[in-house]
Amino acid sequence: MCWTNYIAIPLVLKKPLRVYKVGTLSIFCGFISLFRDFRYRESQTMPTVKINPKFTRCNLFVPGYKPQMWDTFYIHEGYHSYLTEEMAKYSMNEYDDIGVFEIPAGATVYVNYRHREIVSTDIRYLGSLKE
């Protein structure tokens, strides 16, 4: 999962936020995220990471058409999650599991509301989603 959006505004959470990740449950290390193979143990808060949005200006030139330009921000680092259970279910396949996580108050986040994705500086694994 690579977070992209046309704006990148950092928000600091005033209260904890529940989010969801797609990955694999493991009896040895809790939950393994599909994104970057991060490993999470239940109730363990992960180390704080720094997030640096990268800016890119894209140009599209097609002969006979008006040139188009758009700006995009990319975020590769940080803890990538989904805001809703439905979006996590939509992004998984039959072999994946969904983990429930909490972004603690005070964490910095970047939100893409259109894709219901969020990137945070801190996160804690709460357990697997029970269906």
Predicted regions, residues:
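Conserved NAD+-utilizing ADP-ribose enzyme module
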Residues: 1-79, 83-131
